[in-house]
Regions:
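Collagenous Gly-X-Y triple-helix signature in extracellular proteins
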Residues: 1-115
Length: 116
């Protein structure tokens, strides 16, 4: 699988805890990235406000499709899913998508779904 995956450059707050510090938004090369808060929702609620200057909402979500993710072993049960965006006002929190598809954040030591 890795042999056919293509690298993609993503911009995110890769420092955290700096509120809305623009210089904290840097690039990384990923092969299977988590989406950012802005790429899901097209708005910023918790992430560093400078992230959105380098991102766009995915067309799939912009078209109004559901942001809800489901458990692989209980496909009728919704699961919260991590975003790659850090919560700008915290050192230990990341953004996530709630079970109803809305934006939220939670402590990084919690277990939530991963949905690239």
């Amino acid at each position: 699988l890795r042999a056919v995956m293509k690298p993609i450059t993503k911009y995110s707050d890769n420092t955290g805890g700096g509120n809305n510090t623009a210089s904290y938004v840097t690039s990384t090369t990923d092969y299977l990235p988590l989406l950012s808060e802005f790429e899901y929702h097209g708005t910023r609620t918790y992430a560093n406000s400078a992230e959105q200057n380098f991102q766009q909402q995915y067309a799939y979500y912009q078209a109004g499709n559901s942001k809800v993710h489901y458990k692989h072993n209980a496909t009728g049960t919704a699961a919260s899913a991590w975003c790659r965006s850090v919560f700008a006002s915290s050192t230990y929190y990341f953004c996530l998508v709630n079970t109803d598809g809305s934006a939220n954040n939670n402590n990084a030591n919690n277990s939530w779904a991963l949905a690239p």
